């Protein structure tokens, strides 16, 4: 058998290809950013053609840099930013419109209408999700209602819908010359259109959004011994690689962190924060603002479910300090600037740029920096930004404990912000539990590689994956209980100030 497995990680701000060996160690990678298109306040788009070009480039470059051929790869996995939605023509491959990103809030009226007339309760029961701008169903409805000619093409079977996993897979396997139109259960579970029990598109839910079933991809398991397809020889890989794993990015991180047992949880720090708790084969409904979602499904096995707390803006808040405020020139400077002060100086930053996600689900909220006085400096704002990342995670951890009845004992973490030592120390302080980072912090790509490799026998099972996991760093809490309670009370007060800012019809 070939000695390596590759993964494409199509994220919110960049696309990367990573190659792993049997020990789960990285042997090569290449990464490219793509443009964030912001046409109106609250609107966030990506260019699908640019995403595909970046995908092809990172795959080819990673192979060339490691001097590997497609025959050296046992399989290829795909992981992706979830919910981001696009539609393209099956005959030409041309997108009808830019991809509407998961952070985009243009569908707030669609989401609000669903809740007002009672359809929201049906969506919660069947799909495990609250009506929100976050999810794909409303985005697809908006596209069908606002893009000229799309409704007719969808009815004729000429228009295809997908999240970015489906778009990448379709192009890798031939595009308009026979590309495979498939998604996996984890991505489908983020649309408000899939029934969690049947793992299929639900006709009643499709009717709520007036979406033709024929434009939707086939739903398959997250790890499939029968490949979804193979990369075409004329494509960027310059050869055939079986594509056998697909996972939404946060579910991929669960697999990469080897959170395969009931009660295991992880927090991924990226553009947003995403904390997932494995609930096993049981569908657990949340009473505290969390989502019920599919964690993964391997082959013919029963699906494994999870509770999730999704936070819209965390890492992107640091980007905002750089790109909009201009108080840092790079993300790493957020730590050095924040270290110039010992605390937040009474300043709290609630980065509700797209409203608030879990556990609040308030699209009427908007960002605010509160508690400012003439005493405060850029350093206090930087510190408040790092604290906001951690306090939002505390909100979700508390909700998760309320739903599960099990308090968190240790938090596994991964993602880019875990390189920020101060932020991770604050996270331990805010939660009052140890925070643990694995040696391989980019667990999203690793999880996609695991899903693909398990399908072809590159890894035999969960024990192989557990043997690969190694602790890389641990942070223990240093705050007193009084300090922790006082800080969190200030955060909750700040959150309250951001609500009811935008009128949502």
From Swiss-Prot:
Binding of sn-glycerol 3-phosphate, residues: 12, 82-83, 134, 249
Its pathway, per UniProt, is:
Polyol metabolism; glycerol degradation via glycerol kinase pathway; sn-glycerol 3-phosphate from glycerol: step 1/1
Q: Enumerate the Gene3D superfamilies for this protein.
A: 3.30.420.40
Residues bound to ATP are 12-14, 271, 315, 319, 416
Tell me the InterPro entries matching this sequence: ATPase_NBD, Carb_kinase_FGGY, Carb_kinase_FGGY_CS, FGGY_C, FGGY_N, Glycerol_kin
Its keywords, alphabetically, are: ATP-binding, Glycerol metabolism, Kinase, Nucleotide-binding, Transferase
Q: Which residues bind glycerol?
A: 82-83, 134, 249-250
**Activity control, per UniProt:** Inhibited by fructose 1,6-bisphosphate (FBP).
Catalysis: reaction(s): glycerol + ATP = sn-glycerol 3-phosphate + ADP + H(+)
What Enzyme Commission number(s) apply to this enzyme?
2.7.1.30
| Single Gene Ontology MF annotation | ATP binding
Give the superkingdom in one word.
Bacteria
Task: Tell me one GO biological process term.
Answer: glycerol catabolic process
GO CC terms in record: cytosol
What positions does the entry give for ADP binding?
A: 12, 16, 271, 315, 416, 420
Which Pfam families does this one have? FGGY_C, FGGY_N
**Family according to the record:** Belongs to the FGGY kinase family.
Described function: Key enzyme in the regulation of glycerol uptake and metabolism. Catalyzes the phosphorylation of glycerol to yield sn-glycerol 3-phosphate.
What is the recorded name of this protein? Glycerol kinase
**What organism does the UniProt record list as the source?**
Mycolicibacterium gilvum (strain PYR-GCK)
